[in-house]
Amino acid sequence: MPADGGKGLLDTNILILRNRIEHGALPAEVAISAVSLAELSAGVHQAHGPEASAERARRLLLLQQVESEFDPLAFDATAARHYGRIAGAVSAAGRSPRRRVADLMIAAVAAAHQLPLYTTNPADFSGLGEFVEVVAVPRPHSEG
């Protein structure tokens, strides 16, 4: 779905891929959740393997760019109440909300601020349509 010039909340994957995402696929005004900052920060410390040092540096640079560009929306009491309803619905549908905590918290922030949620992973938010509008953004052809 193309952007309509409004405002939207970006999922963490959009922050990681956004330099390669088609500009018109995102809203004119974008916001992020503090939960996405937490995911990006954790990613810096979870880089392992033979290229870990270079990967940590790349992830840290992305985190610093995002921190300097955005004033994230907090996961506050209103978002917490939305999270409770969302997690309850996920559980009632027979799925475990525990494996999806960060995604559900991001969805709750979007719901609390009445913002559509832009993601390249819409399946992560399946079944949440009554709580938040999920906008599927095409993945870039080359992610490398």
Question: Which residues does each PLM region occupy?
Answer:
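Conserved catalytic-loop position in the HRD/HxD motif
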Residues: 11
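Conserved acidic donor-binding loop of glycosyltransferase catalytic domains
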Residues: 120
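Anion (oxyanion) recognition and catalysis
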Residues: 111
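PIN-domain endoribonuclease scaffold, especially VapC-family toxins
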Residues: 2-8, 18-108, 126-144
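Flexible glycine-rich beta->alpha loop in the catalytic core of nucleotide-sugar glycosyltransferases
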Residues: 123
